[in-house]
Amino acid sequence: MARNAEKAMTALARFRQAQLEEGKVKERRPFLASECTELPKAEKWRRQIIGEISKKVAQIQNAGLGEFRIRDLNDEINKLLREKGHWEVRIKELGGPDYGKVGPKMLDHEGKEVPGNRGYKYFGAAKDLPGVRELFEKEPLPPPRKTRAELMKAIDFEYYGYLDEDDGVIVPLEQEYEKRLRAELVEKWKAEREARLARGEKEEEEEEEEINIYAVTEEESDEEGSQEKAGEDGQQKFIAHVPVPSQQEIEEALVRRKKMELLQKYASETLQAQSEEAKRLLGY
């Protein structure tokens, strides 16, 4: 069974409506809302616009109308919404209610508005048109920024480069580079040597002789000999352990030194002599 909206669109229904309106003068809606000076008529034209919007919103739900028809319907709905806003402003000027605050906004909320697009809305199948769907897709949130404490948790020996040689890659490369660098230095030294020989220069003995870094000089042997003592048979005798004063002995020596400094500073010569005599008698 056909719906009421489809019945109203049939040819017979339109013909019957035309017969009923033959003897009547159809009043047309003013082009500008400011041309209307009566509040009841302004209310009438507003209701008429709402009815037209409702019909077009119902039509645009059909995705089989085609892209161009859907775009035209969406443009017409937005145009009627702007016109409805003009009539609401005019009604308020004529002393009527402020529909911008108290009026229903169901028709406005049926469409989605693209931010920054001057109030243009998309209704029904227009939301799924090519190029429109992407406008409503939300951008992914950026990853949360890590704090300094979280970054410090990920720092290990590898961050400081202590594990660079464990991967088995850098060591062969370093060996190859070292081998190549040594060969270059040897070739350079040979070239310089041949150039000096060609000029007739003699090489210095310091360059020919290798310095023995393990050789012990006489000065070093004298210093080391200060810790050695000769035995009865003339052989060297090494001291295995050098006595070191304990912490208590060091503290007692510091106390005695401090007492002597105080006596020299505050006591007279006679008192110091008496103190020394008393120590001698007591056997200190």
Swiss-Prot record:
Family assignment from sequence similarity: Belongs to the ISY1 family.
Record region (Disordered): 196-243
Biased composition (Basic and acidic residues): 226-235
Phosphoserine: modified positions: S246
Keywords: Acetylation, mRNA processing, mRNA splicing, Nucleus, Phosphoprotein, Spliceosome
Organism: Rattus norvegicus
Gene3D superfamilies: Helix hairpin bin
Keyword Phosphoprotein recorded: yes
Subunit organization: Identified in the spliceosome C complex. Component of the XAB2 complex, a multimeric protein complex composed of XAB2, PRPF19, AQR, ZNF830, ISY1, and PPIE. Identified in a pentameric intron-binding (IB) complex composed of AQR, XAB2, ISY1, ZNF830 and PPIE that is incorporated into the spliceosome as a preassembled complex. The IB complex does not contain PRPF19. Interacts with CPSF3; this interaction is in an RNA independent manner. Interacts with the microprocessor complex subunits DGCR8 and DROSHA; this interaction is in an RNA dependent manner.
Positions with biased composition (Acidic residues): 203-225
Modified-residue entries (N6-acetyllysine), positions: K127
Name of protein: Pre-mRNA-splicing factor ISY1 homolog
Name of the gene this protein is made from: Isy1
InterPro entries documented for this protein: Helix_hairpin_bin_sf (IPR029012), Isy1 (IPR009360), Isy1_sf (IPR037200)
GO cellular component, one term: post-mRNA release spliceosomal complex
Intracellular or extracellular location(s): Nucleus
GO BP terms: generation of catalytic spliceosome for second transesterification step; mRNA 3'-splice site recognition; mRNA splicing, via spliceosome
Function: Component of the spliceosome C complex required for the selective processing of microRNAs during embryonic stem cell differentiation. Required for the biogenesis of all miRNAs from the pri-miR-17-92 primary transcript except miR-92a. Only required for the biogenesis of miR-290 and miR-96 from the pri-miR-290-295 and pri-miR-96-183 primary transcripts, respectively. Required during the transition of embryonic stem cells (ESCs) from the naive to primed state.
